[in-house]
Amino acid sequence: MTEPRLAGASITVPGKLADRAREIAAGRLSPAVPRDAATIVLLWPGVLLRPGAGVEAYLLRRTRALDFAPGACVFPGGSVDEGDADPAIGWAGPPPAEIADRLGTSPERARALVCAAVRETFEESGVLLAGSSPTALVDDSAALAQDRHALLAGTASFGELLGRLGLMLRADLLTPWARWITPEAAPRRFDTWFFAAPLPPGQTASLTAPAEQAEQAGQTGSGESDAGIWLRPAEALESARAGQITLLPPTAVTLGELAGHHDVASVLAQRRVITPRLPKVVVNDHDAWLAMPP
C-alpha cells in the first residue's frame, strides 16, 4: 500500500534524510532514540490591539546556525532536563498523576514535561507561568530579566530560581494539546508534548531582556532564536504558503487546529485525546516524501 503524501502541501525531503530512511528500511541503520521535549503554544486575544484579529500565537524563528530545524518558526520549548523532574519544585494545579492520565504517561514524566515546558518558555520568551500562590501569577516578566539570563547562563537552576522568588508552577494553565515524535529517519529526534496556555496579564513575550539588564547579565537571549512574533494561526499558515516563513509539519498542523477558534477560552476548554503522531519518511528508488499520521 502506498503511503499518502501530506494533503495540500509539498514537503521536500532532503537527500540525506531520504538516504537515512533507505538505510533504516534496509536494516543497516537503527533509528535514533527520541529525547523527551515539551513546548507551549502561547495564546492571547490579538483583538485587543488589532480589531478582528481573534486568537494569536507566539512564534520564534530559530537561527540558521542550529543543527535542528534552522530558520523554522516554532513555539517556545525544548528538551527535558534532569532537574525538571525535581519534586521539590513548587506546583499548583492538577497533581502530576492527573496530568499523566491525560498525557498517557507516568506521573514523574508528566511533572518533568510540564516543568520543561514552563522553563523553556521562560528562557525563550520571558513569559513565566508561575505565581506566589495557586491563584497568583507573575505580572511583570520584565522584572525577571536578570533571573532569565542567569538561567540561560547556567548560573542558577530553574528550581533554585523559583524557590528563591517564592514561586510555584501554575500547571493548571497548561492545556495538553498534542504529542509529536520526530520521524525515524531524522538524525536527531524528539518526543514532544504540546501544551496550550494563555499569556498572563501584565507579561510580555520578548526575545531579549531590556538592554541594560541584558548587558549586566552578559547575554542577549537564548541564542536559539533571532525573531519572535504574534500571528493569527491562519495568517502564519498563509505566510508559510507564500514562502515568507518556514513551518515544521507539527507546527503547521497545530496552527491549522487553532485556526477555527475565535477566542483563547475555547482553545483552553479543549479536552483532547493525546496520542503519539509519528510522521514517516517514505522512499522508493527514485522519490521520497513525508507521510503524515491521521
Language-model segments: residues:
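N-terminal leader/linker segments that precede catalytic domains of diphosphate-processing enzymes
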Residues: 1-123, 127-294
